[in-house]
Amino acid sequence: VLSPADKTNVKAAWEKIGGHGAAYGAEALERMFLSFPTTKTYFPHFDLSHGSAQIQGHGKKVADALANAAAHVDDLPSALSALSDLHAHKLRVDPVNFKLLSHCLLVTLAAHHPAEFTPAVHASLDKFLASVSTVLTSKYR
């Protein structure tokens, strides 16, 4: 459960990310594909080379979804309902992949904002991403 301090940290972090969200999303995807090659199986139609338009486009989708979640942190199930349906019923993404992408996103944010990535902010973002992952996998049952 996200505390009021966590929610404040998440919203502040997302404001700091600002216009870099798409680039950070793409970078996190690239990190995931390099670090966890089995995740590539969900993207057989993508050009997975560094900086490809498809990775950039999907990175923007990831960033936009997370920005929406941060803006609606008090009602994640409603904010992410359509994405949960998509990933559970159409794409059938293994739920472990959300954790892998979350880890890669945390690494990306820490690399770009080391001064702001305090232990408290790290913990808040980790809890937020875990909450997002939980909602995205809620319709798998």
Swiss-Prot record:
Family: Belongs to the globin family.
Positions carrying Phosphoserine: S3, S35, S49, S102, S124, S131, S138
Residues the record lists as N6-acetyllysine modifications: K16
Modified residues (N6-succinyllysine): K7, K11, K16, K40
Encoding gene, per UniProt annotation: HBA
Positions of the Globin domain: 1-141
One cellular-component annotation, GO: haptoglobin-hemoglobin complex
Protein name per Swiss-Prot or TrEMBL: Hemoglobin subunit alpha
Subunit structure of this chain's protein: Heterotetramer of two alpha chains and two beta chains.
Task performed by this protein: Involved in oxygen transport from the lung to the various peripheral tissues.
Organism the protein comes from: Marmota marmota marmota (Alpine marmot)
Tissue specificity comment: Red blood cells.
